[in-house]
Amino acid sequence: MALKIRLRQQGRRNHVVYRLVLADVESPRDGRYIELLGWYDPHSTVNYQLKSERIFHWLNQGAELTEKAAVLIKQGAPGVYSELMAKKMTRKAVMCQKRRAYRQRRSLKRAETAQAVSK
């Protein structure tokens, strides 16, 4: 079951309000959700309220962000977003080091086989 943090449309005509929810990927936009993580009202002076500790928890559990939800979290809970980006960058750096080490081992092995063939 893949989970996404996304916006769920609420409200009435000409006054749309959004809820930030954790939902299954296959559920419809305004359908069933697992947990309410906050809300966003583009019409009021207090635009949003987010539960940053729950957002961070679900992101650590493997939930993915939609583009609009990422923008809202970056604006409303910058600490959560910066930690998420730092985690992604360290993961990317580790994978890059592993790839580099693998390529070096592979090139050494090819050089050894080329020497063995030339003898």
Curated annotation (Swiss-Prot):
Coiled coil (residue ranges): none
Cytoplasm in keyword set: no
GO MF terms, alphabetically ordered: structural constituent of ribosome
CC terms in the record's Gene Ontology section: cytoplasm; small ribosomal subunit
UniProt keywords, alphabetically: Ribonucleoprotein, Ribosomal protein
Gene Ontology BP, a term: translation
UniProt KW Magnesium keyword: no
Database matches in HAMAP family: Ribosomal_bS16
Family affiliation: Belongs to the bacterial ribosomal protein bS16 family.
Protein's name according to its UniProt entry: Small ribosomal subunit protein bS16
Source organism of the structure: Chlamydia felis (strain Fe/C-56)
Encoding gene (name): rpsP
